[in-house]
């Protein structure tokens, strides 16, 4: 006979230690009881009383734990493998089927008897392991040391083990075995039983407490069997409710929780805390309260940081310490700062208007002059004292300025957009302190330099044109919308220059965006090159410096509001064009100086020739050799040549070698051809070519003034190769024709 299923056997075998000994004792007691019932063949089945019971019954079954006779008349008989009824505790061979009709089978109750015997044996074994407690009706499970619950996953595993052991065929185990199994599956659980007084009774049966035990003494059994009833299924073993309580909070967590609850306001406590649970109902596993930290709560930032004042930059203070106490006005008492409670509110929103007047800072326009800023603003207690003192100081300065500047009126500041006007007062010649007052708008620096008076400039340097405006992409120039000025100055409000004069001294405050002219580079045709509002009519050198974009269309708005049309030829950059910033891209390894290179070198020659020649010992001396003729193109001093060539950052020995190769006069000067060839050799060295031992005649012919031997009509060096091919083709055709005519 199988007493347990394989799953329950595995669960029991997994237990070790003291729990394993209890399981072995329970198993032996259950096997002995079943063997005793299986061997006896009785007509009227009787259950022998337990060792501690002196009372038995021949008419029915007796509960060995409670000592009561159980009524089994309404129970169905157990069927065998062949469909026969079996007596309770008997076999098919020893029982007559005819006599079973009057009796009642007790096969369904056999496992209960075995479980009761196993529970009693386990209780005796348990008493030897754990000493009983001082309470009379205390359960031995309550004497167990309290265990902590590891987590929610252990709680679920405990419930699974309970449902497995108490359902279906798994209900053979006793209460102690179930508890031991739970301990094996969940070693960190805290298990307790309800007291007997809290157990509910049913309609047909009741849980029997230890006081109703027939022994009359104190019964430490934790298991009481129901007498029967419709509410309990016949295949289940009903045990007292087991409550698994979660682990208590640690001391540190309790301290943090108590501290947070004490510091919270009553309104917050009413929201966060919940009413105490009802103790009248069944005890259920309660989730431990979450420990709220100051960082996680919504109101904790304001409550914990209430003593922190709002940050502000202290305003500068004028040197009032130099003034006497009589000159200072009485400053009213400033309102105190807001209390910290105004910032710590969970229900009210945090409003920026709660700042006091001490946090109000002064505008930048009121503090423009650097003279108003002083040191020692720490003397003021708050910002209101500083602001009031700042107003007094400004009023005194205004009064002093008005006394000194009575001769200046607002009518002197007259603005004109196109022309510069000068006004002189008709006064006598004896009055030398007559003021010349005028205002100029859109003036150039050349005009300002022609003003016959002392000029004082105030303001920053003119803004240079940034690279993103100087070098715009071709797509931006082609597809930009009409009227789009980008990040540059607005056309409607052009920058102006104002001049204030007094006593023959002019004060110039300029905000003009001046475009500086670069050397040896053409004017780029970008959007900011020739704006009409940036050019002045009375400026004499405006067209010479900036030039005029005559090919481009007028910039007045047209009828179409779409994309602006511009000529592609003016905006696109051709790859074949020479880039002065990157000359190596247009370099071709040829054995002579090209026409383009010769023109660039001649520009350097013209701008630096015939300079510092008086440093030569023979230049102003009348006894110099007449054989030294000065050419028409002029000469260049060797010191000037060295200065120009040194800008290439080539080694000095390389430059000396180049100078020796091109020097033909041997008198400390170079002529035009020598200078141009020397510049070409410097560029060849920068391109990575080695210096030749001797210069080819073709190089000297290419830099000659008339260029006789070098065909420089076509700039493309591949032109000669193509012409040769054409000549060869023509010659081949002529040869073929001659051969045909000769054959004919």
Curated annotation (Swiss-Prot):
GO BP field: lipid metabolic process
Stretches of the chain forming a coiled coil according to its record: none
Comp. bias regions, Basic residues: 556-572
Location of the EH domain: 617-706
Keyword Lipid metabolism: yes
Start-end of Polar residues biased regions: 198-211, 260-273, 378-390
A single cellular component GO annotation: plasma membrane
Stored CDD domains: EH
Chain intervals with Acidic residues compositional bias: 400-412, 537-546
Keyword set, alphabetical order: Lipid metabolism
InterPro entries according to UniProt: EF-hand-dom_pair (IPR011992), EH_dom (IPR000261)
Region: Disordered, residue numbers: 1-61, 76-98, 187-237, 260-282, 302-350, 366-412, 522-574
Protein family per UniProt: Belongs to the IRS4 family.
Known role: Positive regulator of phosphatidylinositol 4,5-bisphosphate turnover and negatively regulates signaling through the cell integrity pathway. Involved in rDNA silencing.
Protein's recorded name: Increased rDNA silencing protein 4
Gene from which the chain derives: IRS4
